[in-house]
């Protein structure tokens, strides 16, 4: 959520910046009208309350003098009715204004490239050499089928499309990867490990920006107003909702492993095979609460920490700076880390690292004090995938595949795989 005072003072400038996102700003245009009306109603209500207090004092004075005050009592009742009507009108206006504020996306940071689609994203850097094969590289689902480590067909029978069973060394590989990721982030970078709830309430989904705009993309529990989490970002960010932290506590860094649940409502026909786009998948999420002046330095740190996973696994990747049209609703700046997928001859997203500035903190009411009696300020929140585990499995199977159908296990992962160095058919 944006700062109302900032929006009021810089309406046209902010509107121009948001226009670069390419989103519908029809609701945004109503802000000025409703905000003006709200302030006018508040003035009227306060004036009438002042008048009512004045008349009340006059009534009391007349009664002390044992004089007739019926005409003033009648006037006071009429003023009370007027206040009641204006209060109802004010509540309606404020409700409409709140809906608009929740629908306005974040302002892109000045360093974000202006563009409309993913084609306008800017490559920041690349790492690693692309593998060379003496044979036609297979897609990871064919490799996994030959190794008997993933079962999409039976998952389709048990649940439906975009689900998978991990089996045998496939399950061991998945577990090895998220344990390896957690150990790196906790032991090397000092994150606090958290296991979050996999269901959250409406306030939590609103706090991080999934609601109300993207409710149709979420899995909702029918009997309760709960949602399956699309990412651990939601419960971990809301861990400090409605709290005032002290400056001494910042930065706060959490690393969380969780299952994630996504409807993929807008992805019909895309990535229908394999692990790239599943309704349920595992992810290690990194979440930061920082002072505003530190947030962009922390974004670089966060991105580098996510990159380190791929470097240790020796998987080639590139880092992309997302343009304004591909930034997402909540981020002020976002980097995507894309890993090389040989069978597709392209890079695919495996992590997004974002700085939300105060956007989520304002929605979730997360603040801090620089001094014990200082005025509370909103923290800046950041998060990034460290990494999406299923996509890492896909990248590993494809980049380390051998002509005989086996897959070499990266050296960094072998201690987590019982010191195996290869998965054989």
From Swiss-Prot:
Enzyme class: ligase
Pathway: Aminoacyl-tRNA biosynthesis; selenocysteinyl-tRNA(Sec) biosynthesis; L-seryl-tRNA(Sec) from L-serine and tRNA(Sec): step 1/1
Record's GO cellular component terms: cytoplasm
GO molecular function, one term: transferase activity
Sites where the protein binds L-serine: 231-233, 285, 385
Domain note: Consists of two distinct domains, a catalytic core and a N-terminal extension that is involved in tRNA binding.
Name of protein: Serine--tRNA ligase
Organism name: Bacillus licheniformis (strain ATCC 14580 / DSM 13 / JCM 2505 / CCUG 7422 / NBRC 12200 / NCIMB 9375 / NCTC 10341 / NRRL NRS-1264 / Gibson 46)
Origin organism lineage: Bacteria, Bacillati, Bacillota, Bacilli, Bacillales
Gene it is expressed from: serS
């Amino acid at each position: 959520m944006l700062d109302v005072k900032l929006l009021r003072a810089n309406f046209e400038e902010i509107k121009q910046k948001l226009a670069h996102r390419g989103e519908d700003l029809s609701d945004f245009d109503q802000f000025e009208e409703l905000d003006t009306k709200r302030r006018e109603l508040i003035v009227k209500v306060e004036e009438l309350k002042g008048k009512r207090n004045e008349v009340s004092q006059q009534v009391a004075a007349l009664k002390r003098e044992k004089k007739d005050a019926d005409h003033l009592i009648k006037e006071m009742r009429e003023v009370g009715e007027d206040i009641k009507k204006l209060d109802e009108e004010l509540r309606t206006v404020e409700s409409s204004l709140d809906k608009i504020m929740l629908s306005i996306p974040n302002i892109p940071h000045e360093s974000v490239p202006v563009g409309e689609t993913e084609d306008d994203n800017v490559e920041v850097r690349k790492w690693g050499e692309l593998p060379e094969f003496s044979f036609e590289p297979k897609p990871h689902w064919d490799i996994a089928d030959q190794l008997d480590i993933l079962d999409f067909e039976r998952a389709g029978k048990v649940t439906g499309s975009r689900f998978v069973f991990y089996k045998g060394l496939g399950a061991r590989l998945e577990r090895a990867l998220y344990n390896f990721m957690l150990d790196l982030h906790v032991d090397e970078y000092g994150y606090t490990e958290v296991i979050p709830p996999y269901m959250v309430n409406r306030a939590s989904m609103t706090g991080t920006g999934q609601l109300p705009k993207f409710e149709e993309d979420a899995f909702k529990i029918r009997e309760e107003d709960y949602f399956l989490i699309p990412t651990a970002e939601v419960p971990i960010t809301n861990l400090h909702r409605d709290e005032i932290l002290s400056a001494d506590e910042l930065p706060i860094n959490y690393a969380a492993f969780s299952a994630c649940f996504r409807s993929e409502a807008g992805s019909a026909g895309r990535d229908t095979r394999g692990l790239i786009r599943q309704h349920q998948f595992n992810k290690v999420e990194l979440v930061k609460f920082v002072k505003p002046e530190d947030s962009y330095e922390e974004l670089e740190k966060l991105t580098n920490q996510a990159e380190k996973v791929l470097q240790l696994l020796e998987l080639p990747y590139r880092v992309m700076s997302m343009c304004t049209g591909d930034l997402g609703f909540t981020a002020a700046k976002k980097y995507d880390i894309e890993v090389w997928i040989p069978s597709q001859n392209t890079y695919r997203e495996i992590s997004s690292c974002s700085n939300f500035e105060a956007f989520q903190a304002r929605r979730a009411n997360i603040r801090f004090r620089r001094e014990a009696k200082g005025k509370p300020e909103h923290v800046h929140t950041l998060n990034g995938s460290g990494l999406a585990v299923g996509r890492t499995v896909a990248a590993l199977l494809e980049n380390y595949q051998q002509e005989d159908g086996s897959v070499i296990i990266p050296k960094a992962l072998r201690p987590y795989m019982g010191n195996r160095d290869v998965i054989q058919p």
